[in-house]
Amino acid sequence: MAFGDKTLKRSDKGKDVIELQLRLSGFRGTLWDGDFGPGTELQVFAFQRDYMEMKKPNGIVTAKTFAALGKFAAEFPVDFASIRCRCGKCSGFGQDRFNGQYKVGMPKVEAFHRREYPGVHKAILHSYRTAKFYCQRAGFPPAQITSGYRCWVDNQKHKRESTNHMGKALDVDFPLLAGELKRDDVVRCDKGRGLLVEKSSFQTGWGASNRKSLEPSDIAPTWIHMDVRSYELKYLADEYFVTSSEELDA
């Protein structure tokens, strides 16, 4: 049964629940485990309240809510051209190399996992479009992706060692308005991070497992870095990585 073909509610289980949890990653957010529990219900409440502007959100995903999810995706599209790796050598999303290989001498945790994942994770993409929504509502200029996928070839060109941008992360910024200075960008990005912590349940830093993360302002003062590197490997399975809008919203 295709996503959207049946009503979803608390206690439901299955792949359609996983897809729902991913699409609502930026509305509070929960684990994409296929179990429609209280966390998923709160996601639906948040979407119905904040985007659909329902006076009495019910946490039940009927045809009306499915239609709103489609409208939301169309209103806040993801520009995959801005995400593709710029190395000129890979497909735009790495070469799926180094699975299970970690930086020498470092702990075997995702921060040091050298794998080039086969796309960008759905949770971070859906969280990005939700960030666009909340930031627009707060009066920000339109959010733009400034850094997406960066494979090892691109890393070597720029003398980088980070693995976050191999499918698990996006960097986002906002264009300066007329008369603004870079310090205004610092203030705006701080406010944006605050919105994402409040509305999308991001954590600042990587202290807790299975949480979406933001780089703190001392690392990313004039942009917002968001990633999913703190998740267990089962939540980073290949099926959660996509390379196009068609795959993201299928």
Q: Where in the sequence are the language-model features?
A:
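Second-shell loop/turn segments in exported
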Residues: 3-12, 29-34, 54-57, 109-123, ...
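Intrinsically disordered, low-complexity Ser/Thr-rich linker and spacer segments
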Residues: 4, 68-84
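Short acidic, glycine/serine/threonine-rich helix-capping segments at coil-helix boundaries
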Residues: 7-72
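Catalytic phosphate/metal-binding cores of nucleic-acid and nucleotide-processing enzymes, i.e., regions
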Residues: 16, 29-35, 54, 126-129, ...
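Surface-exposed patches in mature extracellular/periplasmic domains of secreted proteins
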Residues: 32-33, 56-58, 139-149, 201-217
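Active-site acidic/histidine clusters and adjacent loop/turn architecture
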Residues: 79-140
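Active-site-adjacent substructure of cysteine-protease-like catalytic cores
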Residues: 135-137, 143-165
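Catalytic cores and adjacent binding grooves of peptidoglycan-active enzymes
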Residues: 161-170, 174-250
